[in-house]
């Protein structure tokens, strides 16, 4: 299945498993943050800059460096998507992106599709469980020709400013943030997670699941699975 850009005004993209491999997050970003954590805690535990991340954690962890570190490692191990962890991870990734140690490996169809969409006057929005600052870091340090993809992106949403990605109200918040686009039939949300796709559809917008190498299989008995795409490709015949 291909996409006809003429049918849409707003394109909302998930990140992990949609525009870049799940393995990048699981095998590169998460381990990098854990590796950087002890040094940051040693050097910055009492610094004003780090305090805003530390103090966002529950009280029982923010007063003890060992307890703090143990809690972070436990959350990552259990893949808990909670705002205060995501904010800390974004902070830990910052130096990795700046040094060039981290480069986001976007799928090869993402760069041309984003550019074509913007050229055609479409609005691109990112919605991920990763914090908005972490999203901006990722898209400003990619393997695409110009590296920085942020000029193509109109807005960013995460679990803090929108809400959990499997909840219908989260998509309604995103929609309400762009009242200039009242025709919900001209919105499209793309994600590898069928539960997120279902929530978006329930909110009134169009949505299709994305199949990428390394993703978990989509449930065969779900009607939305039949709509799945495996690449971002524009076709006027779609």
UniProtKB/Swiss-Prot annotation:
Catalysed reaction, written as an equation: 5-methylsulfanyl-2,3-dioxopentyl phosphate + H2O = 1,2-dihydroxy-5-(methylsulfanyl)pent-1-en-3-one + phosphate
Keyword flag Acyltransferase: no
Cofactor note: Binds 1 Mg(2+) ion per subunit.
Nucleus recorded as keyword: yes
Necessary cofactors: Mg(2+)
Localization per Swiss-Prot or TrEMBL: Cytoplasm; Nucleus
Gene3D superfamilies (alphabetical): 1.10.720.60, HAD superfamily/HAD-like (3.40.50.1000)
Pathway(s) per entry: Amino-acid biosynthesis; L-methionine biosynthesis via salvage pathway; L-methionine from S-methyl-5-thio-alpha-D-ribose 1-phosphate: step 3/6; Amino-acid biosynthesis; L-methionine biosynthesis via salvage pathway; L-methionine from S-methyl-5-thio-alpha-D-ribose 1-phosphate: step 4/6
Alphabetized UniProt keyword annotations: Amino-acid biosynthesis, Cytoplasm, Hydrolase, Magnesium, Metal-binding, Methionine biosynthesis, Nucleus
Residues engaged in binding substrate: 128-129, 165
Any GO BP: L-methionine salvage from methylthioadenosine
GO molecular function, one term: magnesium ion binding
EC number(s) from the headed UniProt entry: 3.1.3.77
Ligand binding (Mg(2+)): 14, 16, 192
Domain of life: Eukaryota
GO cellular component, one term: nucleus
Subunit description: Monomer.
Role according to the record: Bifunctional enzyme that catalyzes the enolization of 2,3-diketo-5-methylthiopentyl-1-phosphate (DK-MTP-1-P) into the intermediate 2-hydroxy-3-keto-5-methylthiopentenyl-1-phosphate (HK-MTPenyl-1-P), which is then dephosphorylated to form the acireductone 1,2-dihydroxy-3-keto-5-methylthiopentene (DHK-MTPene).
Family named by the database record: Belongs to the HAD-like hydrolase superfamily. MasA/MtnC family.
Protein name, UniProt field: Enolase-phosphatase E1
Annotated organism of origin: Fusarium vanettenii (strain ATCC MYA-4622 / CBS 123669 / FGSC 9596 / NRRL 45880 / 77-13-4)
UniProt gene name: UTR4
């Amino acid at each position: 299945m291909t996409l006809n850009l003429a049918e849409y005004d707003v394109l909302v993209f998930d990140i992990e498993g949609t525009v870049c491999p799940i393995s990048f997050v699981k095998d590169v970003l998460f381990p990098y943050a854990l590796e950087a954590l002890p040094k940051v805690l040693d050097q910055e535990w009492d610094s004003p800059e780090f305090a805003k991340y530390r103090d966002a954690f529950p009280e029982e962890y923010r007063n003890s460096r060992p307890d703090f570190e143990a809690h972070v490692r436990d959350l990552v191990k259990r893949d808990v998507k909670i705002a205060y962890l995501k904010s800390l991870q974004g902070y830990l990734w910052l130096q990795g992106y700046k040094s060039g140690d981290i480069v986001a490996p976007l799928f090869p169809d993402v760069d041309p599709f984003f550019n074509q969409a913007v050229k055609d006057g479409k609005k691109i929005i990112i919605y991920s469980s990763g914090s908005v600052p972490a999203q901006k870091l990722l898209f400003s340090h990619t393997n695409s020709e110009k590296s920085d993809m942020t000029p193509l992106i109109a807005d960013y949403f995460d679990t803090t400013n929108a809400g959990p990605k499997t909840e219908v109200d989260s998509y309604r918040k995103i929609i309400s943030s762009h009242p200039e686009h009242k025709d919900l039939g001209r919105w499209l949300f793309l994600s590898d997670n069928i539960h997120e796709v279902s929530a978006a559809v329930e909110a009134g917008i169009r949505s299709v699941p994305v199949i990428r190498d390394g993703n978990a299989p989509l449930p065969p008995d779900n009607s939305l699975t039949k709509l799945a795409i495996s690449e971002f490709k524009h076709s006027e015949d779609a």
